[in-house]
A protein has these predicted regions:
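FIC/Doc superfamily catalytic core
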Residues: 2-286
């Protein structure tokens, strides 16, 4: 799904005796009803109860909270956050096959890297504050903006920028994802993983979807207070383990309990590792 029209799908989980209930909403990650988890009130609560998820989310939260207390981040966080945004953009571009080198003259020729850097600028400083405001009111508008920035050099027709594909089900799944973003009380690392995974699965725009998905995960982290200054760099973890990242995303898309839970734990691990990357930035800043 994405942040607008989603068709949250059921994931049947034998989890502490939970059973399917008539009229239950369906959870993100499952491709069909025979491989899905059943949701009661908060659509994401069953995910929190999957093995290892709650503990992984707690570790991610604690690691990010700790790095925010680093002496370099107490007042100098705008500097460290700016460096984090650049590292995140370069790593996100590389995951999708883009270049990572920043030319000395500042002219970035690679379209994937150029788009990722534009997204990084939108997730830094005053621009981030504005983007978070949009995300909290209208997640789909924020997604459209992210795609416009990420794919500006990738599409032949500008009319495609910010517009989800017209394929059946895309709008519905985006809508359900958006409602989940606005209403779920799930731990922020879990919500970030679901938003990320659903966008990777749906590929709603047909271009730059990976960059958009990872940026949306960052928006969840910032807007929820998990990583309020956007100091973490989980993208480095995903790049270093690119094949494992892609395999975990495929597991999420399959919708099995193991696949969905494995993806969430993997993403929580990336957030925890991203806090270590943030610490290295802060240490270098003094």
């Amino acid at each position: 799904m994405t942040l607008t029209d989603c068709d949250l799908r059921r994931v049947r989980v034998s989890n502490g005796g939970r059973h399917a209930r008539s009229g239950a909403r369906r959870l993100p990650g499952a491709r069909d009803a025979s491989t899905s988890v059943w949701v009661v009130s908060d659509v994401l609560q069953p995910l929190v109860d999957l093995p290892g998820v709650r503990e992984a989310a707690d570790r991610a939260r604690d690691a990010l909270a700790e790095v925010h207390m680093h002496k370099a981040n107490r007042r100098g966080w705008p500097t460290t956050a700016a460096e984090a945004a650049v590292r995140a953009a370069r790593s996100s571009a590389a995951i999708d096959g883009g270049a990572t080198e920043l030319p000395a003259d500042g002219r970035v020729a690679d379209p994937v890297l150029a788009g990722a850097l534009r997204v990084g600028q939108a997730l830094d400083g005053d621009a981030l504050r504005n983007m978070v405001g949009v995300w909290q009111r209208a997640p789909l508008q924020a997604l459209a903006r992210l795609h416009l920035l990420a794919a500006a050099d990738l599409v032949a027709d500008e009319i495609e920028l910010g517009r989800p594909r017209a394929d059946a089900g895309v709008a519905q799944r985006l809508d359900l994802l958006a409602q989940t973003v606005l209403t779920s009380d799930a731990p922020a690392p879990v919500l970030a993983a679901v938003v990320h995974g659903e966008l990777m699965t749906l590929r709603p725009f047909g271009s730059a979807d990976g960059v958009v998905a990872r940026a949306a995960s960052r928006l969840v982290a910032v807007s929820s207070g998990l990583d309020p200054h956007s100091l973490g760099v989980p993208e480095v973890f995903w790049l270093r383990r690119r094949q494992a990242y892609l395999d975990a995303a495929s597991g999420f898309a399959a919708g099995t309990a193991d696949g969905v839970g494995g993806w969430v734990v993997f993403c929580c691990g990336a957030l925890e590792d991203g806090a270590r990357e943030a610490r290295s930035i802060a240490d270098a800043a003094g």
